[in-house]
């Protein structure tokens, strides 16, 4: 029986490249001259810091555009609330990987509500979808791509 997996993964090298490109662009921007602003990443957690909250928002937009340029979906970003300590504003952004329990339940409910002729099984942080026909699996793929969930999904391990 044909099957495929629904996963949510981030290419960490592309994530690092996007942060490096954002840092390069930050160094050349006129509105950030003479301003203490930084952008760093460690273990899939980005840390933004700037002197004003408006500059922090600009850093966030800068990171988001560079992520999109590098092919990393910006829906994987999970920003925390900005923190103001002394003279600097900091914001920590975590990147979501894996399909968590509530999201997998939403996906299963979505597939069941559309009466697709497939079976869905949760396997850790991914979902395995099996069906009798390849067309049913492709219909599930287009259904998931068309929904607005807070996470980016990839389809891999397609077996016939």
UniProtKB/Swiss-Prot annotation:
InterPro entries: DUF520, UPF0234-like_C, UPF0234_N, YajQ-like_sf. GO terms for molecular function: nucleotide binding. Keywords: Nucleotide-binding. Pfam families: DUF520. Signal peptide: none annotated. GO terms for cellular component: cytosol. CDD domains: YajQ_like. Nucleotide-binding protein. Belongs to the YajQ family. This is Nucleotide-binding protein Ping_2261.
């Amino acid at each position: 029986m044909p099957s495929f997996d629904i996963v949510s993964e981030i290419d960490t090298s592309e994530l690092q490249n996007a942060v490096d490109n954002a840092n390069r662009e930050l160094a050349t921007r006129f509105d950030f001259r003479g301003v203490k602003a930084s952008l760093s990443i460690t273990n899939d957690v980005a840390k933004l810091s700037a002197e004003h909250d408006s500059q922090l928002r600009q850093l966030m937009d800068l990171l988001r555009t560079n992520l999109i340029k590098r092919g990393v979906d910006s829906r994987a970003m999970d920003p925390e609330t900005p923190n103001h300590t002394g003279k600097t504003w900091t914001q920590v952004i975590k990147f979501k990987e894996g399909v968590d329990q509530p999201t997998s339940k939403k996906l299963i409910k979505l597939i069941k509500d559309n009466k697709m002729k497939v079976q869905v099984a949760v396997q850790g942080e991914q979902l395995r979808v099996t069906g009798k026909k390849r067309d049913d699996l492709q219909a599930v793929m287009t259904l998931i791509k068309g929904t607005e969930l807070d996470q980016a999904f990839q389809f891999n391990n397609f077996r016939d």
